[in-house]
């Protein structure tokens, strides 16, 4: 398994080249590739992210990213999703995931879902879609309060998902494992 994030190629042009070389090597050896889109506006513009990351998606099997990442990194406009209100409309994710599956042929598309009630009170769940069958699943929701520190939440989510899939869990069980690992 090879995992990378959108942060790595954002660091420099040399990092873009090295990331693509690593992805080519992974694919040449039939290694599953996952990405956490992880857009960081302080590292690069949405325009450059879209140019670079769209090219790298040809190597990706499993794509993790929220609706902002899908828009800023891949150019997909979210439909019925409003994270600023703390209310998440799953239909918006189904729409975005279908667009991503159509364009890139991902095996799985995943997003963590954070409902921010306050800085120390969040709802936490995730959703996944099988890119081939278009089966969509929304995980159990955790109510996290008080939040001690959000640093590393996305990384532990990705690690839990990868662990679940490598261990042979189906997509639903792998997603539940990822959400629990990062809650």
Tell what function each PLM region has.
Residues 137-183:
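Conserved post-catalytic alpha-helical subdomain immediately downstream of the catalytic base
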Residues 1-144:
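Ribokinase/PfkB-type carbohydrate-kinase core domain
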């Amino acid at each position: 398994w090879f995992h990378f994030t959108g942060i790595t190629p954002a660091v420099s042009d040399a990092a873009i080249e090295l990331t693509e070389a690593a992805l080519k090597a992974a694919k040449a050896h039939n290694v599953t590739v996952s990405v956490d889109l992880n857009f960081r506006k302080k590292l690069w513009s949405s325009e450059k992210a879209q140019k670079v990351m769209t090219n790298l998606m040809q190597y990706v099997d499993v794509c993790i990213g929220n609706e902002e990442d899908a828009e800023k990194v891949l150019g997909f406009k979210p439909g019925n999703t409003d994270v600023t209100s703390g209310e998440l409309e799953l239909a918006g994710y189904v729409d975005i995931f279908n667009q991503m599956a159509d364009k890139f042929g991902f095996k799985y598309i995943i997003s963590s879902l954070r409902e921010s009630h306050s800085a120390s009170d969040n709802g936490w769940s995730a959703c996944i879609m099988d890119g081939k069958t278009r089966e969509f699943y929304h995980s159990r929701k955790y109510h996290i309060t008080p939040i001690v520190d959000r640093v590393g939440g996305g990384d532990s989510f990705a690690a839990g998902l990868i662990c679940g899939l490598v261990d042979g869990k189906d997509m639903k069980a792998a997603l539940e494992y990822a959400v629990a690992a990062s809650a």
